[in-house]
Structures are given as structure tokens and as C-alpha cells.
């Protein structure tokens, strides 16, 4: 008699059966799928990715759980969130981008636990970071940061960096600009963060907003209207963006823009920003 391993696929079972005169299954045989969640995907986009790959049993349940208090008691970083009633998805920012193994049509709650457990592991994991004399963790960097932003605020900044930056180097300059704008006085002509990436959240763009709502849609996270940070993260950032949020470059920049190839242009004044935009428009058509 042969006992089969849990989660053996059909081909393995058939091979095992052929080499034995008898066998019995001791656990439910379940096929699995490998799914990669890329940095910057939002809760809505992750739901689509999981569903497309056959890893999610109930998309609507997944989205509902992502805005519930179900996980507060198990994860302090979720329980510590503020503005919960104003967020579109409480778990936005904490579904860590990575490659995961899921059962086909896996229970939504089980899927979310895998994301949150991984995030908890990552923020407690020691790693080498430029500027630190010894290995450190995300939580330690938050604790020691001069800005005194909470972990949730850091994740919100990181999510914006992830959404706006063209590459890793750009992340540290955009981090600097965000930190500068958050502490700027009115004499600099900076009244808000004014970021396109927040304008239509939880959607990526106006085209992603349901057609019936497009003409009147207004996001609560729109940083053109709202001062300071949005109510929470706008996507799920990777570790590079999180570290950049905690370690901004030192600069006097308050503005940035990119051309169609991702080349970044930074500016200290609105006049310089407008000149950069005019320059890009002159050749980037």
C-alpha cells in the first residue's frame, strides 16, 4: 500500500499508482497554481489577477474581506490603521507583491492570510540597507525615522512612490519630493501633493471607472483637493518603494514630471516645473 502526499498532482498520482498494486488517498488531492503579483497592483487589480489565474474562488468575497475588520485581531499593522471608515479597501498596501502558491479556486480568506502573513514576515526581516551600519528591518527603520510617520503613513507614501516612479533611482527623488511637499509652507506655492496617481483611486484611470459613474466620479483620495496624504495606500508597494519612503534623498525639489520614455525631470519651483513640461511637450509628441 502507498500513501499519497498531500497536494500531489494527477500525473504524480498516476505514476505512483502504476508502480503499486494498491494505494489509498489519505488527504484531499488539490491542484495548485503559481501566481505572481507585481509591485504596484491595487486590491482591484490583484483580485483580477487571482481570478484570471484560477486562484480565487469568490472575487466579490475577496473584495469584501479586503475592506472588513476580519483581520484586525491577527495583525497589529491592520488594527493600527486610522481613517478606516474613509478607506476604499482597508488591506490596500498590505497585500505584499510576490509569487504565491494557491489552491485552485482557493477560499478568499485563506488567500488573504497568505498575503498578510508574507507582509508581516517581510517587515520583520533583517536586510542590508544603504546608509545603515548593520542589517535592519522595516519596523526598526520606521521606529528610528526622524519623520515620525507611522507604518501606515510610510506604506501610503511608499504606494505613491511605487505608482509614480519610473525606476528604483527615481523612487528616492520622488520620496524626497513627497516629504518636502508634506512639510512645505504656503510661500512655496505648494498647497497639496497634487498627484495624478490618486485622482481616480481605487481605479487606475478615468477609463477604469464604471461608465455610469465617470461623469460625476470623485475620489476621496484625490490629492489635488485633499491636503496631506490620502486616507491610505493607493496600491501594494514592493520593498524598494518602502525603503525609499523611509530614506528619501536630500533635495530642495518640490515638483517632478516624466516624459513618455520614463525620463524624470525634477524642479524646485513651479516656474522650473512649467519649463520642464514645456520642454517635454516640445519633443515628446
Spell out what each predicted region is.
Residues 1-122:
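Signal peptide-directed extracytoplasmic domains
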Residues 55-56, 71-285:
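Bacterial extracytoplasmic/cell-wall-associated proteins, especially those involved in peptidoglycan
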